[in-house]
Regions:
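Conserved acetyl-CoA-binding loop-helix of GNAT-fold acetyltransferases
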Residues: 99-115
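Conserved beta-strand in the GNAT
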Residues: 60, 66-75
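A short, internal acetyl-CoA/4′-phosphopantetheine-binding micro-motif in the GNAT/acyltransferase core
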Residues: 90-102
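A short beta-loop-alpha structural element at the N-terminal edge
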Residues: 1-15
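Conserved beta-strand-loop-alpha-helix junction that forms the acyl-donor binding cleft
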Residues: 123-138, 159
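A conserved beta-turn-beta hairpin within the catalytic core of GNAT-like acetyltransferases
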Residues: 78-89, 151
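A short helix-loop-beta-strand connector motif used in the catalytic cores of GNAT acetyltransferases and
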Residues: 39-60
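Conserved GNAT-fold acetyl-CoA-binding loop/helix
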Residues: 21-43
Length: 160
């Protein structure tokens, strides 16, 4: 089941972020501040369903009473200075135990939230991914199936 997150979900959502981190390219060199994760998620859940700058959508995938995935999206001013808003994803993560369609269903929930907001134009709804987690190409294909197109690249400095 996909649903909006509640405050009681935060401890498990912190664990999900830690699981994502452990599978990421950052795991060997960057630790996780559970306090920062908790604070971030608490703020996001507080603003869950918001329709103004800083508003969020926080969705979870739940199976047999256990959270197996999360999605966090946020509203910001277009180009950070615009008089309209854009929707951006912050986190999308599902465990191997999640349902096959959970990621897709959480994205659908994000799109419904963004599309219902008259301050957000359709072309200002964004989805992103990087090579931080394995399976990036699969995520890109899912986004394309949802009607999204590539809109640039992210570059990072090479380690020395």
């Amino acid at each position: 089941m996909i649903r909006r997150a509640t405050f009681s979900d935060i401890p498990r959502m912190v664990e999900l972020l830690c699981e994502a981190h452990a599978a990421s390219k950052f795991a060997a060199r960057v630790g996780v501040s559970r306090k920062a994760a908790h604070t971030l998620l608490q703020q996001a859940v507080t603003r869950n369903g918001g329709t103004n700058d800083g508003g969020t959508i926080v969705l979870v995938a739940e199976h047999a009473g256990v959270l197996e995935g999360l999605f966090v999206g946020v509203l910001n001013r277009v180009y950070f200075i615009g008089d309209k808003l854009e929707a951006n994803d912050m986190y999308l993560f599902v465990t191997p135990s999640a349902g096959r369609a959970d990621a897709s269903k959480m994205i659908d929930g994000y799109l419904e939230w963004a599309d219902a907001n008259p301050k957000v134009d359709r072309q200002d709804v964004k989805l992103s991914y990087t090579d931080a987690l394995p399976g990036a190409a699969r995520v890109g294909r899912l986004y394309a199936k949802k009607g999204f197109r590539r809109a640039g690249e992210i570059f990072e400095r090479a380690a020395q």
